[in-house]
């Protein structure tokens, strides 16, 4: 789907769905498979532009990726090779940052770039810790922005104490540590998503976790099988809509419920949503469950501190849901939203205010008073997939009034089937 889109759907939302595979796990399955000693078989890989970027990158480094039935098979090269051209990561910050860590220890010259949005996203936070390991890195605008030039060289292990919890920075350092001499440790102020640690351990890499510290030593993964659960960041749009839209009930099956990613479920519970889990199990090292949310009378809450890394990507649609909650919802410690694909605090604040929301922005968050009836509005998505999908949810809460999204091509970044699934859940949707 490309170009602008006029949303005129009507709720409630009712039904049972599966959302596509988790984007974070999909990236790692391809990349770790390319680093391995044997082939990796992946089931449920997300078919979206961000993951396509990682696939192209690992192929440029010598890996072979092929489809076999419902699985994707990653066959690693004997050793990663210098890419023959600039590696284009598209809109994927995960691809660029994790590859920066890997390529720091791979002999040769690599240049990592991306689209206009990615080239505005910060990379110094990755470059500085990798340099402490001996990496030879440079980037545009005083090492602040991509492209990133990597000259692979021998690395040494280091202890990194991060000021901001970031799974991407942590993962870049741990992956560089696989090529380094000695141990590499990352210490975070709060726990970020731990898919890297889980997958590396599942592929035979010794990983030591001690509270907020993670340590690896030089090793090469052995490959294996990865079964990707549904992405909770994608499910968030339907779960938040169901909680706020009277008469709604939505079940998302086979959903990833890794504890480092379930901040959204905690917030839904704190706001009074009717939420339940069933069929809880663990597959290939990742917890999953069927999650059901029913509409309820929501109330405001305070969101901040250690929970923020566990729901940072879901906060835009949480802001939409908060407009329908009685009382005041306050989000703090979320400054990271300002350096995503867009400044998501500014983008959502502007869009919701124009739709009639009572919202006050802070440097690191916002306060929203509710409940407030929303109205139709024209929205600048700023080429940000989560802004587009969040405001499609806002349209449902606007009593069927039209919301015009100026560009929805960005949704293909993470969730190409979003609008089709939304239509299937809507009664009288279009």
From Swiss-Prot:
InterPro entries: Enolpyruvate_Tfrase_dom, Enolpyruvate_Tfrase_sf, EPSP_synthase, EPSP_synthase_CS, RNA3'P_cycl/enolpyr_Trfase_a/b. Pathway: Metabolic intermediate biosynthesis; chorismate biosynthesis; chorismate from D-erythrose 4-phosphate and phosphoenolpyruvate: step 6/7. Pfam families: EPSP_synthase. GO terms for cellular component: cytoplasm. One of its GO terms (biological process) is aromatic amino acid family biosynthetic process. CDD domains: EPSP_synthase. The active site is at 313 (proton acceptor). It catalyses: 3-phosphoshikimate + phosphoenolpyruvate = 5-O-(1-carboxyvinyl)-3-phosphoshikimate + phosphate. It is an enzyme of class 2 (transferase). GO terms for molecular function: 3-phosphoshikimate 1-carboxyvinyltransferase activity. Phosphoenolpyruvate binds at residues 23, 93, 121, 168, 344, 386. It is found in: Cytoplasm. Transmembrane segments: none annotated. The keyword Translocase does not apply. Gene3D superfamilies: Enolpyruvate transferase domain. Monomer. Catalyzes the transfer of the enolpyruvyl moiety of phosphoenolpyruvate (PEP) to the 5-hydroxyl of shikimate-3-phosphate (S3P) to produce enolpyruvyl shikimate-3-phosphate and inorganic phosphate. Belongs to the EPSP synthase family. This is 3-phosphoshikimate 1-carboxyvinyltransferase. It comes from Anaeromyxobacter sp. (strain Fw109-5). The gene is aroA.
């Amino acid at each position: 789907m490309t170009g602008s889109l006029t949303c005129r759907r009507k709720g409630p939302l009712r039904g049972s769905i599966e959302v596509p595979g988790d984007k974070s796990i999909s990236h790692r399955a391809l990349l770790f498979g390319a680093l391995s000693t044997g082939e990796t078989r992946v089931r449920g890989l997300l078919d979206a532009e961000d993951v396509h970027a990682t696939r192209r990158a690992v192929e440029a480094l010598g890996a072979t990726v092929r489809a076999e039935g419902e699985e994707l098979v990653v066959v690693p090269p004997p050793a990663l090779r210098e890419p023959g051209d600039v590696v284009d990561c598209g809109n994927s910050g995960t691809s660029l940052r994790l590859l920066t860590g890997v390529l720091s220890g791979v002999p040769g010259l690599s240049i990592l770039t991306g689209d206009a949005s990615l080239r505005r996203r910060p990379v110094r936070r990755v470059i500085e810790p990798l340099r402490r390991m001996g990496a030879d890195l440079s980037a545009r605008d005083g090492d602040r922005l991509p492209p990133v030039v990597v000259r692979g060289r021998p690395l040494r292990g280091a202890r990194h104490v991060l000021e901001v919890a970031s799974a991407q920075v942590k993962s870049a350092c741990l992956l560089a540590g696989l090529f380094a001499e000695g141990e590499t440790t990352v210490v975070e102020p709060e726990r970020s998503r731990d898919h890297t640690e889980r997958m590396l351990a599942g592929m035979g890499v010794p990983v030591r976790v001690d509270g907020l510290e993670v340590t690896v030593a030089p090793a090469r993964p052995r490959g294996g099988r990865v079964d990707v659960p549904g992405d909770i960041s994608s499910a968030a749009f339907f779960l938040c809509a169901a909680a706020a839209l009277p008469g709604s009930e939505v079940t998302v099956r086979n959903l990833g419920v890794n504890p480092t990613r379930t901040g959204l479920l905690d917030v839904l519970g704190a706001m009074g949503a009717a939420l339940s889990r069933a069929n809880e199990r663990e597959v290939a090292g990742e917890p999953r469950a069927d999650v059901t949310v029913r509409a309820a009378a929501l109330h405001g809450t305070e969101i901040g501190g250690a929970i923020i890394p566990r729901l940072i990507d879901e906060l835009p649609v949480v802001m939409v849901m908060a407009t329908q909650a009685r009382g005041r919802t306050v989000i703090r410690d979320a400054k990271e939203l300002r350096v995503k694909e867009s400044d998501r605090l500014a983008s959502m604040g502007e869009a919701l205010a124009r739709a009639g929301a009572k919202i006050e922005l802070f440097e690191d968050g916002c306060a929203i008073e509710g409940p407030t009836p929303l109205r139709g509005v024209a929205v600048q998505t700023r080429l940000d997939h989560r802004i587009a999908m969040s405001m499609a949810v806002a349209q449902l809460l606007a009593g069927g009034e039209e919301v015009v999204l100026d560009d929805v091509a960005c949704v293909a970044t993470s969730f190409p089937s979003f609008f089709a699934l939304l239509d299937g859940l809507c009664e009288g949707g279009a």
